[in-house]
Amino acid sequence: MDGAREVRSPRGSTLTARSWQTEAPLRMLMNNLDPDVAERPDDLVVYGGTGRAARDWASYDGIVRTLTTLGDDETLLVQSGRPVGVLRTHEWAPRVLIANSNLVPDWATWPEFRRLEHLGLTMYGQMTAGSWIYIGTQGILQGTYETFAAVAEKVGRPDDDGVASLAGTLTLTAGCGGMGGAQPLAVTLNGGVCLVVDVDPERLRRRVATRYLDEVADGLDDAVARCEAAKLERRALSVGLVGNAATVYPELLRRGVEIDVVTDQTSAHDPLSYLPEGVELGEWHEAAEAKPEEFTDRARESMARQVAAMVGFLDAGAEVFDYGNSIRDEARQGGYDRAFAFPGFVPAYIRPLFSEGKGPFRWAALSGDPADIAATDRAVLDLFPDDAKLHRWIRAAGERVAYQGLPARICWLGYGERHLAGLRFNEMVASGELSAPIVIGRDHLDAGSVASPYRETEAMADGSDAIADWPLLNALVNTASGATWVSIHHGGGVGIGRSIHAGQVSVADGTELAAAKLERVLTNDPGMGVIRHVDAGYARADEVAAERGVRVPMRES
């Protein structure tokens, strides 16, 4: 892409913008494109197939130039990765408002999106790529860890501490990019063995370098031997295998390899980002661009073969789930009629957490100093002394997770918890315990910020899977509450036409104004999750609303 260059975020406490409220989005935009963070930084692609941080390098330069001069009573407007205006607002307003990839429903198809993208009119923002709060593979790691912990409660048995474990089980998955790369470490943190398949050897090498993957096998026979030995010894191990999942999954099924858990996190949401059988890795992007319709058909046929094998494992007694990449629907379109025989991960494991407003709470140290994250880790443990799962996660993350770009951390916190962490971080900045401000955000995958019938809102109790008012309300609420930047995206995770979602990021800069904003944003944002699930009829959400004082008019008499 014209204008490509290496980008890294500034570190330290010296401002390059006019305040931390504008320095923060500037640094996080740059961090998204750090070579240690982004999948294809020269193309502005951060993760998730083609999820970009900016539409093109000229737009990137325009965003950077504007953020360095933006005042604290001004708001930058970003339309699908392109800076389109600056308006005078007020100090409580967001400094940046972002809308990415949004299309009128009848036009919300991949072919139409690609036509508009080719004209330079839009870009695919994924979830945290175009909203500038991607923190590398760690960003999805705890959610993946929690998912496999829930799987362990179904298929595993308690370890010495009485906690369900995946020890003695083998998980098969595919896709080891920015999102899928969390899977091998999440499985091993839960005590299990993981075999992860990816067509790109460089992705596997990168996950080994960042300690998300233990080792790479020399071939299928070697991979199976390593995994079966570790499973027999009840030893945690993750093994990468270079191969195409559409070939490997059916072959493992044919061999009768005893696999306990099966999922997938390839970029199936975009058929052009899934390599079909018979296409060489080096020919991938050229073939996809030359004949996109033919490539899409071939990719879907390959997905159909992979999903058919997944259903074969299901029939053989394995725990099988869709990890939110639309592979079931793509396989259905590829001609496989049992594609929905297994559930998505949210209804299977995560929805009880969403009913409590619990979801991915992440923060990054703008200083670039890992000591600041270590200090915030201690603060979180101090704030929530009775949360054993949280303590186990924070300790494991501190020991096992390598930082990518600016040091960062993620943990799942719920309604009534997130604002406590935000306020504590702000106090630590004010006192000098932290050497620079902290940015606090989340994935768009959260309790009340997504409409995605194949993922976050699949199988809602009241049938409201496709109701998209909720993420729009979420963005409006965060804008009204004082978030530093707010985003509304379309198509993240599951692909164009299948989701609407919103995000927020807030800055803890140590000021009283920041404290007031943080208390509102970090209360109201997860509060939307409780409200959404109360409205859908979830009893646990009703209990949380009553216990924690969330007002729901239709529940008031």
From Swiss-Prot:
Binds 1 NAD(+) per subunit. Coiled coil: none annotated. Keywords: Cytoplasm, Histidine metabolism, Lyase, NAD. It comes from the Bacteria. It holds the Pfam family Urocanase. Signal peptide: none annotated. The keyword Mitochondrion does not apply. SUPFAM superfamilies: Urocanase. Its main location: cytoplasm. Pathway: Amino-acid degradation; L-histidine degradation into L-glutamate; N-formimidoyl-L-glutamate from L-histidine: step 2/3. GO terms for biological process: L-histidine catabolic process to glutamate and formamide; L-histidine catabolic process to glutamate and formate. It is an enzyme of class 4 (lyase). It is found in: Cytoplasm. NAD(+) binds at residues 48-49, 126, 178-180, 198, 203, 244-245, 265-269, 274-275, 323, 493. PANTHER family: UROCANATE HYDRATASE. Belongs to the urocanase family. Catalyzes the conversion of urocanate to 4-imidazolone-5-propionate. This is Urocanate hydratase. It comes from Beutenbergia cavernae (strain ATCC BAA-8 / DSM 12333 / CCUG 43141 / JCM 11478 / NBRC 16432 / NCIMB 13614 / HKI 0122).
